[in-house]
Amino acid sequence: MDLTEFNEIRPYNDEELPQIFEELIADPAFQKAATGAIPNVPFELLAQKMRACKTKLDFQEAFCYGILWKIAADHTAGLTLDHTAIPDKSKAYTYISNHRDIILDSGFLSILLIDQGMDTVEIAIGDNLLIYPWIKKLVRVNKSFIVQRALTMRQMLESSARMSRYMHYTISEKNQSIWIAQREGRAKDSNDRTQDSVLKMLAMGGEGDLIDRLMEMNIAPLAISYEYDPCDFLKAQEFQLKRDIEGYKKTTCLLYTSPSPRDS
């Protein structure tokens, strides 16, 4: 297998991190985002902490783990994970889950896996979300691999086949678990049905017949349940706009900085 075919989509290798960290640290847009997310820590200290990370897991434990547990502490009554159906912690799994929030779904899963003595997951993320170069770099530091969108039909087939080969390689050879949503985009109406195209994509890689290829992925269906949908008011707003404006299409990203009423 020629692993270089995955270079465009895979997470960074650990030996690539020092250069990527320096590129991020030198990026004014990343500096602004980092100081906004962690306002009480000087950026120089954040940069020093980044440079001390030797692996992607080091980075996740240094930054993501604490931030996600703080979100959980501040905005939830607690997180739980029932992992009893797949007790073998040494195996890699493909967690296919319903989808509510691209950061929290996979992030909460990863920190709960860490607390059970397991590795974090690699995350399938669409390139439509990677609107700035620093975001694309950061998610690949955070063990994400890229799902390419907005392609021609032929390009989409080629991209799907490559991603399937990468996922089979990740599970079988790297022994690294994966998180992927069961459908493209969030289920805004809570209709959590797995898209046929997701299963077809998984079966494009590997060897043997259809069942063999899917079995090779060690699929673990995952149901994520939030008392309140993390993006509920944004989804309601979009539904209303689609109802009231003929031909409405979501084309802009609205950022809200005021706290949610339920957090006050």
Model-found features: residue ranges?
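Membrane-anchoring hydrophobic helices of lipid-metabolizing enzymes
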Residues: 1-93, 99-110, 114, 120, ...
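Hydrophobic/aromatic beta-strand patches that form the interior of the parallel beta-sheet core
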Residues: 124, 145, 178, 218-222
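Conserved nucleotide-cofactor-binding alpha/beta core module
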Residues: 122, 126-146, 150-153, 157
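Loop-centered beta-sheet repeat module
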Residues: 162-207, 216
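Basic/hydrophobic alpha-helical interface regions
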Residues: 121, 158-161, 165
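Acidic, Ser/Thr-rich peripheral helices and adjacent loops at domain boundaries
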Residues: 237-249
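Conserved small/polar residues in nucleotide/adenosyl-binding loops
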Residues: 256-263
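A conserved active-site cap/scaffold subdomain adjacent to cofactor or substrate pockets
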Residues: 226-228
